[in-house]
C-alpha cells in the first residue's frame, strides 16, 4: 500500500475525538502529541498558534494524520463555534475544574492542552464545556503536555473499552486466507 492508501484505511478506523494544542512552545511535545494521537487514531490534531515543531519527535506519523494549523486563539474559537466542537480543556488550576476520572469525555470531544508555562488560554477556558484536571500526587507543578494528552486519550479509550466497545479496530478478515489484513 502506498501512503495515501494507508491514510485512507486509517481514516476509516479513526475515532471521533480531536486533540488541540494551544500555543505550545516545546517542539518535542508537539511531535510527541502527534505521535500519540496517531496511536489512538484521533480524527484530527489542531495546532493553535504553535511554534515550529520537530517532525522527528512524531516519528513520521504526521504523514498519516490530519493536522490543522490555526494561527490564533480567536481563529480557533471561531472554528470551534462554526464546527460545533465540544471543547474539553485540560488545566490544573482553573475554577470549577473536574477531575479526569469524574469528567465527561464525549465521543467527539476536542481535548485542549495548553502552553507549558501559561496553560490553556483564558478565552478557550471560558468557551470550554468542561475544564479537567489530571490528578497529581507529587510536588511537581504539572505534567508535560505530551504526557497529559496521552493520559487523556488513554482515559477516553479506556471508557469505551469498559463499555465493551472495540477501541482499536481490527483489520477486516481476508476471505481467501481467513486472517486479518
Locate predicted features.
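Post-transcriptional modification and biogenesis factors for structured RNAs
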Residues: 1-181
Amino acid at each position: 500500500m502506498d501512503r495515501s492508501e494507508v491514510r485512507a484505511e486509517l481514516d476509516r478506523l479513526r475515532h471521533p475525538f480531536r486533540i488541540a494544542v494551544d500555543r505550545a512552545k516545546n517542539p518535542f511535545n508537539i511531535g510527541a502529541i502527534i505521535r500519540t494521537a496517531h496511536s489512538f487514531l484521533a480524527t484530527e490534531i489542531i495546532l493553535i498558534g504553535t511554534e515550529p515543531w520537530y517532525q522527528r519527535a512524531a516519528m513520521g506519523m504526521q504523514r498519516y494524520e490530519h493536522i490543522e494549523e490555526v494561527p490564533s486563539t480567536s481563529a480557533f474559537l471561531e472554528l470551534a463555534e462554526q464546527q460545533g466542537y465540544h471543547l474539553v480543556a485540560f488545566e490544573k488550576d482553573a475554577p470549577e475544574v473536574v477531575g479526569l476520572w469524574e469528567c465527561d469525555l464525549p465521543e467527539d470531544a476536542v481535548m485542549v492542552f495548553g502552553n507549558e508555562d501559561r496553560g490553556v488560554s483564558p478565552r478557550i477556558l471560558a468557551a470550554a464545556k468542561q475544564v479537567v484536571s489530571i490528578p497529581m500526587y507529587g510536588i511537581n507543578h504539572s505534567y508535560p503536555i505530551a504526557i497529559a494528552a496521552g493520559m487523556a486519550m488513554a482515559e477516553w479509550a479506556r471508557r469505551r473499552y469498559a463499555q465493551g466497545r472495540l477501541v482499536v479496530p481490527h483489520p477486516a478478515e481476508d476471505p481467501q486466507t481467513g486472517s486479518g489484513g
